């Protein structure tokens, strides 16, 4: 994203490793553009006391609890910083005033298209590939995840236990 655009409409913010950008149960008020860092999106199930990682984002991506942001409802997921983040944020109200700008409208449509395509690809992957195939795909197409994310989060992202991931890794390596 162009730095001039970011500086004009967005505010620079920093988050430390382990910090929650968005907390489940709170309404999302900001759209973030990750300039640097890594975050994970996860759901926490209090009945099983288990976290499930559903997405991992790196630099140069937009980040928010989209449903909460749009519907003004408490977020069902949390967004946690895995590697220190530098981001640019814009509030909901300010964002709405920008939508009248044709250039920004093009950006918003691009963001929505990107989010929808990623969601559909992720769903297809989980439904059509085995955990081992998903892990091999990550190794080939997204090695940043393997290199930068703790194995317990990778296992959760794939939908398996850490022990099952360990067995997959032994077979591969």
Question: For the regions a protein language model found, what residue spans apply to each?
Answer:
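Short proline/glycine- and basic residue-enriched helix-capping loop/turn segments at helix->loop/beta transitions
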Residues: 1-17
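Short beta-strand segments in beta-sandwich/barrel cores
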Residues: 11, 38-43, 62, 86-87
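Glycine- and acidic-residue-biased ligand/ion/polar-headgroup-sensing regions
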Residues: 18, 29, 33-41, 59-60
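Short phosphate-coordinating micro-motif centered on Lys-Gly-acidic
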Residues: 21-26
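Interfacial loop at the N-terminal end of multi-pass membrane proteins
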Residues: 42-56
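Cyclic-nucleotide recognition modules
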Residues: 53-111
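Short, Lys/Arg-enriched N-terminal segment that forms or immediately precedes the first helix
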Residues: 115-124
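Phosphate-/nucleic-acid-contacting segments
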Residues: 129-173
